[in-house]
Amino acid sequence: MGRYENAAALAALVRDTEVHRDCYADAEVFDLEMKHLFANTWVYVGHASQVPKVGDTYATSVGDQPVFMVRHADGSVRVLHNRCPHKGVRLVQEGCAHAGKFIRCPYHAWTFRTDGSLLAVPLKQGYDPQCFGATEAAAGLAPVGEARVYRDFVFCRLNPVGIGFEEFFGDSLSTLDNMVDRSPEGRLEVAGGVLRYMHRCNWKMLVDNQTDTCHPMVAHESSAGTAVRVWNEAPEGTPKPMAVELFAPFVNPYAFFEGMGIRVWANGHGHTGVSDSLHAAYSPVPGYWDSMVAAYGEQRAHAILGDVRHNTVYFPNIMVKGPVQTLRLFKPLAVDRTLVESWTFRLVGAPDLLLERTLMYNRLINAPTSVVGHDDLEVYERAQQGLASRARDWLNLARLYEPGEQERTVAVTNGTNELQMRNQMRAWVRFMTADMPEGVAA
């Protein structure tokens, strides 16, 4: 047994206002995250619009486990482990594909129905029925512990026993509701492909940064700050480019971010942008308001579009931006390596200019060739390098800490409070140890 393979040792890594560097830099801790954390939590798999037809598949990973979702014959979306029960071959290639009426292994042509059940085995007369029926392979493809489709967002929990979907997410699902409701038809579709790039840092650094509101005006001074300075020199009457609208809020002063507010929920979820947001001052899109009023009525349309949450963290590893219809998935590959996927969505029934803004935002902020995102990348990688130092063991999360705050399951507070980071790490302890005999209720 390793030094951290017990609940007490893991819990000792997280204090009220500090986190031990091993949470970000120790390979054993990372392996335990793959075994426990990503198995005990509800993790994002994909979006139902990626598998629109029966037999469509989308292959990805949850933690270190290869999985795929597939549209079954009854129209439901199933999530299965991406492993043939015969010789262990990965069945579905990464990304979107179409399997047809059944899934066929490329090695020995064993075939499976789209619910994972075994359909056919070549030369089956070579297997004794009683003997074969007692093997694991006879059960077909292994499903994940549980899967749930919510407003077309597909999540799964790998472990067969654990916290329920509604209990895990609670009121945090209101962010997904708001993003979907921004469509006059109440539907989203994945659009514009996916942008991926590698980060040589621990995955939790990216999650932490989503609600770190004390860094934008510093880290993004050379990128967003330059864009603002150039715009300020433009001749009077020059139409304001969409790119400037997207860049400018990143260099707002501390007072703006303090007033923006932050909300946390139980189990590690939370968001910035309660009373104001980086996305609150975009130019109106012609025709959009009228289509929303026609769909929802004026009062409801005001409520939907007036909720401009900035970054919503869904623990453990996604961030959603409802007002610009983007989702970032932080896929852990190693203790010091993370693949970031940036996804964009179309508001079905809304003007195309909204999708244009979404795609531009993703390119400017979240792409491998982005401007703002590379400021963050540089800092993440410097942080990972700095953690090699043994001069200090603890990272500080003490900003605006209040004794006893962990007793509150929902809180709204100053936008520069590090409460959400502390909230995440308390959830980290809980779900890292949930399936251990001496599990810790953090």
What are these model-predicted stretches?
Residues R71, S76, G145-A442:
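C-terminal catalytic domain of Rieske-type non-heme iron oxygenases
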Residues A39-P52, G126-C131, V308-Y314:
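Short Pro/Gly-enriched beta-strand edge/turn motifs at strand-loop
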Residues M1-A9, E438-A442:
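Basic/polar N-terminal segments that are highly enriched at the extreme N-terminus
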Residues C23-G63:
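Glycine/alanine-rich phosphate-binding loops at beta-alpha junctions
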Residues N6-C23:
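Short, contiguous pre-domain boundary segments
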